[in-house]
Amino acid sequence: MPIIQSVERALQILDLFNEQATELKITDISKLMGLSKSTLHSLLKTLQLHGYIDQNPENGKYRLGMKLVERGHFVVGSIDIRQKAKGWLTELSRRTGQTTHLGILDGREGVYIEKIEGKLAAIAYSRIGRRLPVHATAIGKVLIAWLGEAELNALLEGYQYTTFTPATLASREALMSALAQTREQGYALDSEENEQGVRCVAVPVWNHESRVIAALSLSTLTSRVDDAELANFREQLQQAGLALSRALGYPA
């Protein structure tokens, strides 16, 4: 496997910091890395630009940045919620025969962090770790529907409404209308908007602060599940979403 030297060096810099070395001068880093200060300068500035390295204004020493704290909370939180959600997803897939997912928001995209394959609806394109367009998936709509106005506007600034099927929402206006409907009814639908032949429904997962931190979804094959059956599945999904939310401290 080819190694990208600049990336490896950047990671090695991050690994230098520990409980005994919370702050380091560039001369310290230079000695430990065996690199010139001029070479290190560009690496440190790049890490600093992206928030992974910070510089103490009082002494000029470098230290780990808050971006690592954010990423750490993201990883720990996703592991915890994944463990809690798996039981509900497994039971829902067993009862319905459909494929269920757990997704979270990461930047401008959703990400599947759990998937339980249904015996009656094998969804080949979905997998744990797959990134999801928020405008074209039920999970994506749920994950952004309850964001604050400023946060949502920032997320959608310059957003690309890529068309995946004839049913894909192709504009901000169409998406905003769908998000309003999602908030009103408490769930989102994806009717072949991301993948032809597949319909999905998703519901929010709330935490103890009454904030949406994830979404549960159920995916069906359009040819095998009619509207009435999908509505039944949606009700079961909503029950699972509420149960998981309460397990996470949601006060409802």
From Swiss-Prot:
Residues 25-45 bind DNA. Residues 81-250 form the IclR-ED domain. It holds the Pfam family HTH_IclR. It comes from the Bacteria. One of its GO terms (biological process) is negative regulation of DNA-templated transcription. InterPro entries: GAF-like_dom_sf, HTH_MetabolicPath_Reg, Tscrpt_reg_IclR_C, Tscrpt_reg_IclR_N, WH-like_DNA-bd_sf, WH_DNA-bd_sf. Activity may be controlled by xylonate. One of its GO terms (molecular function) is DNA-binding transcription factor activity. SUPFAM superfamilies: GAF domain-like (SSF55781), Winged helix' DNA-binding domain (SSF46785). Residues 4-66 form the HTH iclR-type domain. Involved in regulation of xylonate catabolism. Represses the expression of both yagA and yagEF operons. Binds mainly at a single site within the spacer of the bidirectional transcription units yagA and yagEF. This is HTH-type transcriptional regulator XynR. It comes from Escherichia coli (strain K12). The lineage of its organism: Bacteria, Pseudomonadati, Pseudomonadota, Gammaproteobacteria, Enterobacterales.
